[in-house]
C-alpha cells in the first residue's frame, strides 16, 4: 500500500512539473512573438526577424501568393520584399489576440498601410507560428486574399 502511495505521489509530481514546464514554454513563446509584433508596430523590427533560415511558410487559400515557401529567403524574396515595394508607408500591425498552445503561437492581427498609388491597404491576418528555441520554424498564414491580390495586381512594385 505504501508503495502505491509513493508511486502515485511521484506520478502526480511528474505530471505537475510537466504541466508547469509546458506553461512556461507557451508563455515564453507568446512573449517572444508579442515583442516582435510590438517592435514591428514601432518600426524597429518585425515578426519576420524570428524566422529560422530553414523555416517553411505556407499561405493558404487562392491568393496570388498562396503556396509553401521552403525557407526564409524564398519567402522574403518572393512575398515580403515585393509586397513592401508596393507600399509607400510601412505595414503597421495591430494585434487583436495572441494565443499559445504547446510550441505554437497563434496571432490574429490587422495590418494597415498606404499603397504607392495613394490608396489604403487594410487586411486581417492569422498566423500559426511553430516555435523552437525562440525562432519560427514553420508558419501557416491566412488573410483576405481579395484585399491582398487587389494590392498585388494594382500596384507595381518599386524597389
Pin down the residues of each PLM region:
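Bacterial N-terminal signal peptides that target proteins for export
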Residues: 1-7
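Short, low-complexity N-terminal intrinsically disordered segments enriched in polar/charged residues
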Residues: 11-50, 155-159
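Alpha-helix initiation/capping motif
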Residues: 22-26, 64-72, 118
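A beta-strand edge to alpha-helix "cap/lid" segment located at domain peripheries
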Residues: 22-25, 81-159
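Hydrophobic pocket/interface hotspot
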Residues: 33, 46-48, 55, 75, ...
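Structured segments of extracytoplasmic/periplasmic soluble domains
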Residues: 36-43, 50, 54-57, 82-86, ...
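A solvent-exposed, acidic/Ser-Thr-rich amphipathic alpha-helical stretch
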Residues: 53-100
Amino acid at each position: 500500500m505504501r508503495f502505491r502511495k509513493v508511486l502515485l505521489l511521484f506520478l502526480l509530481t511528474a505530471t505537475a512539473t510537466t504541466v508547469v514546464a509546458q506553461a512556461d514554454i507557451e508563455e515564453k513563446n507568446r512573449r517572444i512573438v508579442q515583442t516582435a509584433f510590438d517592435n514591428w508596430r514601432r518600426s524597429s523590427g518585425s515578426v519576420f526577424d524570428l524566422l529560422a533560415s530553414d523555416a517553411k511558410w505556407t499561405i493558404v487559400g487562392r491568393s496570388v501568393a498562396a503556396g509553401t515557401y521552403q525557407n526564409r529567403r524564398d519567402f522574403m524574396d518572393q512575398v515580403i520584399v515585393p509586397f513592401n515595394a508596393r507600399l509607400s508607408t510601412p505595414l503597421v500591425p495591430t494585434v487583436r489576440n495572441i494565443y499559445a498552445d504547446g510550441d505554437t503561437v497563434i496571432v490574429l492581427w490587422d495590418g494597415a498601410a498606404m499603397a504607392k498609388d495613394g490608396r489604403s491597404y487594410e487586411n486581417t491576418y492569422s498566423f500559426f507560428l511553430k516555435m523552437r528555441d525562440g525562432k519560427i520554424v514553420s508558419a501557416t498564414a491566412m488573410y483576405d486574399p481579395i484585399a491582398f491580390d487587389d494590392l498585388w495586381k494594382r500596384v507595381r512594385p518599386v524597389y
